[in-house]
């Protein structure tokens, strides 16, 4: 397992420290490149690498040929034939802070003599994305694809030709008039997020191990010894560089190279630009950062390359990287820290969630001190204990989570987590149903923690939209026992609000105005605001549309609720239990008392027309050859069928297209008839 500077005491002997760093970095490289089982966060690796570089800079006599600083890193796996690259596949130096980019631009400008003029002449750079995948080289001879190899250690890689041949985005024959005799295309094999999710759905359906992330999935798929397995994996490719070129002149700029690649039929990413100077580089970086989470694939930074080929040649290379390029990496999304305690939080519905209390660590652009552990089963599965050194992940707006513990660093006094039997907030008992992963406090609205969360949910924009009722105000209202249920909100007055801490008179009046406005809502919003487990906005709208008014919903049996579009057994039972609880009915009556919350009510939705599928439940999954899912749904409903969202024993038919996933496996397990699109059409025509 991984060891870092934290597990090896600092020493005054640079030689000893350098030797340990080299061994640790090589071990991490082997785990990452050969085993495809990375166990050291990128940020930790970068920190160790920079420390070794610093030691070798101060003590040049300690540099040895096999130091990680003198090569790219990694070894060819024994299961594939080695391929020696005619031109090395080098890695890039990294920059992290804006200052690093300004310094890079200055170094380039100085070396090219552009900073000597007055005013300085800005350097043109090609800026593009840094994909989180696997680097490969494709060789084409007279336009025909003949070989593919991984980067390996930069000098020798692995022959993965047959596997790469299965990647549909990679042309087996180049097109266009300008096809060279020999061309080595450098690029990245990756897996799009949507394809990764579908792959894991298939893995789950087949009861096989799921992949941790798209990069691991891409790497594992590319290095399959059986290319038939690779062919079933949804891999993609983007070209971004060049190795050997024979039979024509090298394009004058990097941007022209990528334009030429597009002419040849090679996939080139469109998120690229030619920019000038450090200001242009940073503008591109921050622009990409704003839309990073919305991109359909994972990236871990951007890459800058001097655009002109002659200037690249003039700048040349250092031992392991080109001087004309730099990778500008986003803040690390994973980091190491110590787990000092595990507490539990109580959610709006009483869910008890273990929360890791951490030594502060900077990850994903923010300092993290808490991270979710999801539930008791996850803590057990990952074998996470108090006192462990853990890997923490934070990406974008996602809640930080503990990924795993480093078992080789576990202290002797590490303690296992014990789920409490009583709620830490109200003292009520904690229960966990046999078929659920979540334990829950049974205190209901008696529990202040649930009370606060329930009020916060009630006030959300998509619920009753009570502007100005934030968490701090709710905390005071609950802690001072001024509000116990949502109905109490409409009883508070100006004097009460004005006395709250840091709550000005204007704020008090604004909140009262917002409460008055919230009294006029819709049935769907009101249902959603109640915070019924498993009832989101869509289900609330379906309930309102189906029943037309609140009383029929409150009195509906589970069987009646199952007739609502997309309501399955679990949701129906949750709704039924909520309205069966007398306390909930009391709160609802208080809310719709005269002068309180009102909404327009109407008749229930008309019964589905009788047809050949009247009374039948059908589930759609996958992609149909000629029909969009909504079209198929409309056809089935027009024939009287209920189109459900999940497969159960009550499902009469499953209509399955391509990439059917777990619903198909569930249907086969339950013996539900499975139809393709043609079968569905025959069913609609009454031929089945």
UniProtKB/Swiss-Prot annotation:
<protein>
    <recommendedName>
        <fullName>DNA ligase</fullName>
        <ecNumber>6.5.1.2</ecNumber>
    </recommendedName>
</protein>
<keyword id="KW-0520">NAD</keyword>
<dbReference type="InterPro" id="IPR013840">
    <property type="entry name" value="DNAligase_N"/>
</dbReference>
<feature type="binding site">
    <location>
        <position position="188"/>
    </location>
    <ligand>
        <name>NAD(+)</name>
    </ligand>
</feature>
<feature type="binding site">
    <location>
        <position position="447"/>
    </location>
    <ligand>
        <name>Zn(2+)</name>
    </ligand>
</feature>
<dbReference type="InterPro" id="IPR010994">
    <property type="entry name" value="RuvA_2-like"/>
</dbReference>
<dbReference type="Pfam" id="PF03119">
    <property type="entry name" value="DNA_ligase_ZBD"/>
</dbReference>
<dbReference type="InterPro" id="IPR003583">
    <property type="entry name" value="Hlx-hairpin-Hlx_DNA-bd_motif"/>
</dbReference>
<keyword id="KW-0234">DNA repair</keyword>
<dbReference type="InterPro" id="IPR041663">
    <property type="entry name" value="DisA/LigA_HHH"/>
</dbReference>
<feature type="binding site">
    <location>
        <position position="305"/>
    </location>
    <ligand>
        <name>NAD(+)</name>
    </ligand>
</feature>
<dbReference type="Pfam" id="PF12826">
    <property type="entry name" value="HHH_2"/>
</dbReference>
<feature type="binding site">
    <location>
        <position position="329"/>
    </location>
    <ligand>
        <name>NAD(+)</name>
    </ligand>
</feature>
<dbReference type="InterPro" id="IPR013839">
    <property type="entry name" value="DNAligase_adenylation"/>
</dbReference>
<keyword id="KW-0235">DNA replication</keyword>
<feature type="binding site">
    <location>
        <position position="423"/>
    </location>
    <ligand>
        <name>Zn(2+)</name>
    </ligand>
</feature>
<feature type="active site" description="N6-AMP-lysine intermediate">
    <location>
        <position position="130"/>
    </location>
</feature>
<comment type="function">
    <text>DNA ligase that catalyzes the formation of phosphodiester linkages between 5'-phosphoryl and 3'-hydroxyl groups in double-stranded DNA using NAD as a coenzyme and as the energy source for the reaction. It is essential for DNA replication and repair of damaged DNA.</text>
</comment>
<dbReference type="InterPro" id="IPR001357">
    <property type="entry name" value="BRCT_dom"/>
</dbReference>
<dbReference type="InterPro" id="IPR018239">
    <property type="entry name" value="DNA_ligase_AS"/>
</dbReference>
<dbReference type="GO" id="GO:0046872">
    <property type="term" value="F:metal ion binding"/>
</dbReference>
<feature type="binding site">
    <location>
        <position position="128"/>
    </location>
    <ligand>
        <name>NAD(+)</name>
    </ligand>
</feature>
<feature type="binding site">
    <location>
        <begin position="91"/>
        <end position="92"/>
    </location>
    <ligand>
        <name>NAD(+)</name>
    </ligand>
</feature>
<dbReference type="InterPro" id="IPR036420">
    <property type="entry name" value="BRCT_dom_sf"/>
</dbReference>
<dbReference type="GO" id="GO:0006260">
    <property type="term" value="P:DNA replication"/>
</dbReference>
<dbReference type="GO" id="GO:0006281">
    <property type="term" value="P:DNA repair"/>
</dbReference>
<keyword id="KW-0464">Manganese</keyword>
<dbReference type="InterPro" id="IPR004149">
    <property type="entry name" value="Znf_DNAligase_C4"/>
</dbReference>
<feature type="binding site">
    <location>
        <position position="151"/>
    </location>
    <ligand>
        <name>NAD(+)</name>
    </ligand>
</feature>
<feature type="binding site">
    <location>
        <begin position="42"/>
        <end position="46"/>
    </location>
    <ligand>
        <name>NAD(+)</name>
    </ligand>
</feature>
<dbReference type="Pfam" id="PF01653">
    <property type="entry name" value="DNA_ligase_aden"/>
</dbReference>
<keyword id="KW-0460">Magnesium</keyword>
<comment type="similarity">
    <text>Belongs to the NAD-dependent DNA ligase family. LigA subfamily.</text>
</comment>
<dbReference type="InterPro" id="IPR033136">
    <property type="entry name" value="DNA_ligase_CS"/>
</dbReference>
<keyword id="KW-0862">Zinc</keyword>
<dbReference type="Pfam" id="PF00533">
    <property type="entry name" value="BRCT"/>
</dbReference>
<dbReference type="InterPro" id="IPR004150">
    <property type="entry name" value="NAD_DNA_ligase_OB"/>
</dbReference>
<dbReference type="GO" id="GO:0005829">
    <property type="term" value="C:cytosol"/>
</dbReference>
<feature type="binding site">
    <location>
        <position position="441"/>
    </location>
    <ligand>
        <name>Zn(2+)</name>
    </ligand>
</feature>
<keyword id="KW-0436">Ligase</keyword>
<dbReference type="GO" id="GO:0003677">
    <property type="term" value="F:DNA binding"/>
</dbReference>
<dbReference type="InterPro" id="IPR001679">
    <property type="entry name" value="DNA_ligase"/>
</dbReference>
